[in-house]
């Protein structure tokens, strides 16, 4: 069984995986000819890495979207907490990164340039268990967000 495949794309060879890092829960958008990716960083700070690529093969990190989490409890290690599965969007000349903190709610940070600077986190919905945001803007300009729910964040870990 091969773990890594050599692949050819437009005459260019590359080897999977193309990123030798743990970028959990990635979300990727395309703006023009550029691709941008964000990923979970949990309680590691700075947090929420933002990467850039023009070909989905070669990536470089541009920024960290979060300098500090807005709760004192994150000043200490907290396994399983912090930023989970962020979502990156581009709308009306602005980059948005929606960041769930599953014990606190959904937060957003914005920047005109993906390299930053990124705004301080702003809570858009205080909630327990909200994860995996999927925001979008409708044709009428209204913004909406679908999300998942982690029941384990509300005191139920397992049922036997």
What spans do the regions from the language model cover?
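Carbohydrate-active catalytic/glycan-binding domains of CAZyme proteins
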Residues: 1-160
């Amino acid at each position: 069984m091969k773990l890594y495949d050599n692949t050819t794309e437009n005459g260019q060879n590359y080897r999977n995986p193309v990123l030798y890092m743990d970028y959990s829960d990635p979300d990727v958008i395309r703006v023009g000819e550029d691709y941008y990716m964000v990923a979970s960083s949990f309680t590691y700070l700075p947090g929420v890495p933002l990467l850039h690529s023009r070909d989905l093969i070669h990536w470089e990190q541009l920024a960290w979207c979060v300098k500090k989490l807005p709760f004192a409890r994150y000043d200490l290690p907290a396994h399983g907490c912090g930023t989970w599965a962020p979502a990156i969007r581009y709308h009306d000349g602005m980059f948005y990164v929606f960041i769930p903190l599953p014990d606190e709610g959904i937060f957003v940070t914005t920047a005109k340039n993906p390299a930053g600077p990124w705004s301080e986190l702003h809570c858009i919905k205080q909630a327990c268990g909200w994860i995996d945001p999927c925001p979008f803007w409708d044709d009428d300009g209204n913004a909406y967000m679908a999300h998942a729910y982690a029941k384990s964040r509300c005191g139920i870990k397992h049922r036997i």
